[in-house]
């Protein structure tokens, strides 16, 4: 099977959480270093963003807005003020999507957006397999002053069938 074809398969959150875990920790630590106390942060429902939560817990007076079902519980456990987007739940990735999620995001202006994807092509296209999750990510990027892609090495050079944005549309890409 083609390596790019494998990236088109929806892998459940609980399995993805274990993949590239050391690399995700390095990326999460770097990403959290951008966030000063008192920031408002969008986190998507990716496992890479989820790994940031313990590092964000070291900050004071944050507000984190997320469409991640599992992220909400972790944020609460870490005593971080959190807002869930609500919406329809995609069970495989534990993400809220849909019009309710988009409306909630549009009500806020965040300082930062941290998100992940399934593919970052050599020409800078950021892609994923989930159109509904991409819509949520796009709305987060639109309503954040700065947006960063959290990118593990397995995503580089891959292209999935739904375009999210390009590297030129965001502030930066954080890698291990």
Question: What is the meaning of each model-derived region?
Answer:
Residues 1-42, 53-58, 73-80:
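HTH-adjacent hinge/linker in prokaryotic transcriptional regulators
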Residues 18-22, 26, 47, 59, ...:
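Residues at secondary-structure transition points
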Residues 38, 59-61, 144, 170:
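A general structural motif
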Residues 43-44, 66, 175:
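Short beta-strand scaffold positions
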Residues 62-65, 82:
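Short beta-strand element of Class I
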Residues 70-176:
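Conserved phosphate- and dinucleotide-binding cores of soluble alpha/beta proteins
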